[in-house]
Design a protein with these regions (language model features):
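Alpha-helix capping/hinge segments and adjacent helical runs
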Residues: 7-8, 12-17
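Acidic helix-start/capping segments at beta-turn-to-alpha-helix junctions
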Residues: 1-8, 83-86
């Protein structure tokens, strides 16, 4: 696997990209000569997002799909990830839902492939705790004082330790690539 999408598909399906049909996040459609996203699907619009998504390009089952089969459909399966491709490819075809953080709004979103509206608990989380509501006050800084002053490398560390605020139109994409997103995924 060469990127997040092909790695997610390989891990959850247990087979290489050759077999699961997910070679990367995007590939070139030979008929239209345009890039195609691995989970793009115009048949299934997004919920709380303008992005469309489904696992229909994934040609194999996932571990979650197999869990649904072996429990006669009784298993409850959700995939929660910062990124659309990781959530949808991890959820697979039979999941109860897949959730990711929307790049434009910073809210948790999903696809109509799984349901027509977010479950009430996800709607409540978006109202009370969505990344969009917290991102303005969020600053990433090194956890350890040693990391911020590099005292183990140099005799005197920098006077201004590194900090990063999430601002501007790319703030949600930046947040999704920071370590802080792990707590957000856990809380969701």
């Amino acid at each position: 696997p060469i990127d997040r999408a092909s790695a997610s598909a390989a891990i959850t399906s247990g087979v290489a990209p050759y077999y699961n049909n997910i070679a990367g996040q995007q590939w070139l459609n030979r008929e239209t000569l345009r890039p195609v996203g691995c989970v793009d699907d115009a048949k299934y619009s997004g919920i709380n997002t303008n992005e469309t998504a489904s696992p229909n390009k994934l040609s194999t089952s996932t571990i979650g799909d197999e869990l649904k089969v072996c429990t006669g459909g009784k298993a409850i399966e959700y995939a929660i990830a910062p990124f659309r491709d990781a959530a949808v490819l991890s959820a697979g075809h039979a999941a109860n839902g897949a959730f990711w953080i929307d790049d434009a709004s910073g809210n948790w979103c999903s696809s109509r492939f799984y349901f027509n509206a977010l479950p009430s608990w996800a709607q409540a989380y978006n109202r009370l705790n969505a990344p969009a509501a917290k991102i303005g006050q969020t600053t990433w800084e090194p956890y350890s004082i040693l990391a911020s002053n590099f005292s183990y490398f140099m005799q005197t560390g920098p006077q201004n330790p590194f900090k990063h605020k999430f601002t501007g139109p790319q703030r949600y994409q930046q947040f999704k690539t920071s370590g802080l997103v792990n707590a957000e995924v856990t809380n969701m």
